[in-house]
């Protein structure tokens, strides 16, 4: 795994620094920091989502630092400049369990010399990690803010089953089979991202990685005029297929092909309100 240097100052706002913290649950953890000049400040930990980085928080960090906090945003396990995880498709995925992400956060907090965190805030996938941090160690993570992804709570244990026969479980691939059998065959984007070709599809996309990601984020943002959220009635293939193709893709298209028809023009980008 290639070890990259810290981010250069010219790509960061003044007052935000990039560095590495070593030996964090087996990781060489890349972090961004603000408000580090003054010792003893309460700690705020910011956890990014997918597909994002610590860099996503750069414009949030300075206002929090100005409010008197030390603000730290790591590249989570599997992302960015952080190394020490198994990046092979056929590698061991055990280290990516959510409770191990909590250990990563705890290790970082301890390495920075803190015994508690004033606030852990998470966006998207980071919201799940933040929620579990607060659930598992409320003595450390004193408050929590969740953005974009709601937390349903810990798994519910089977109840009153000693004298009652267990109910058969639905097959895990049921929804995927439903989507694939629609008149317009579809697939869930998370299933696609778990397949072997997905990484190469995006790295080698015809648009180029930068343009593809710019189009992908535009497609998912409020700047894309087709985004008109509405509640789904139930968890069925037909109902899920009402969602945009960045969520429920056409079965035989990869994500680069999915984004290609909605790539933003220069005028679209110039008029963006949600993405700078």
Short names for language-model regions:
Residues 51-59, 71:
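Serine-hydrolase catalytic-loop signature spanning alpha/beta hydrolases and amidase-signature enzymes
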Residues 24-34:
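A short loop-to-beta-strand scaffold at the N-terminal edge of the catalytic core in hydrolase folds
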Residues 40-48:
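Short beta-strand element of the alpha/beta-hydrolase
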Residues 55, 62, 106-110:
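Core alpha-helical elements of the protein kinase catalytic domain
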Residues 48-50, 122-123:
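Conserved alpha/beta-hydrolase "nucleophile elbow" surrounding the catalytic nucleophile
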Residues 63-86:
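Conserved alpha/beta-hydrolase
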Residues 2-18, 29, 43, 79-121, ...:
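Flexible "cap/lid" subdomain of the alpha/beta-hydrolase fold that forms the substrate-access gate
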Residues 59, 63, 150:
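Short glycine/proline-centered loop/turn elements that form peptide/ligand docking sites
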């Amino acid at each position: 795994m290639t070890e990259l240097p810290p981010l250069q100052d010219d790509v960061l706002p003044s007052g935000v620094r990039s560095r590495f913290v070593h030996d964090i649950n087996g990781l060489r953890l890349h972090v961004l920091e603000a408000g580090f000049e003054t010792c003893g400040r309460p700690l705020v930990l910011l956890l990014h989502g997918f597909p994002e980085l610590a860099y996503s928080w750069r414009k949030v960090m300075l206002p929090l630092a100005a409010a008197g906090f030390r603000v730290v945003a790591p590249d989570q396990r599997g992302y960015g400049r952080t190394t020490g995880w198994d990046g092979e498709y056929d590698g061991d995925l055990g280290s990516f369990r959510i409770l191990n992400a909590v250990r990563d956060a705890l290790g970082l907090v301890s390495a920075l010399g803190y015994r508690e965190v004033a606030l852990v805030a998470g966006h998207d996938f980071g919201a799940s990690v933040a929620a579990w941090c607060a659930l598992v160690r409320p003595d450390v993570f004193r408050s929590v803010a969740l953005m974009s992804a709601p937390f349903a709570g810990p798994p519910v244990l089977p109840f009153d089953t000693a004298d009652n026969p267990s109910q058969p479980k639905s097959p895990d691939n049921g929804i995927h089979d439903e989507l694939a059998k629609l008149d317009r065959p579809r697939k869930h984007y998370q299933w696609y991202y778990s397949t072997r070709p997905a990484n190469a599809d995006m790295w080698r996309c015809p648009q180029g990685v930068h343009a593809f990601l710019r189009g992908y984020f535009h497609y998912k943002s409020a700047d894309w005029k087709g985004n008109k959220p509405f509640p789904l009635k139930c968890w069925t293939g037909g109902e899920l297929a009402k969602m945009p193709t960045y969520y429920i893709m056409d079965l035989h298209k990869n994500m680069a092909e999915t984004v290609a028809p909605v790539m933003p023009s220069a005028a679209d980008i110039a008029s963006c309100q949600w993405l700078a």
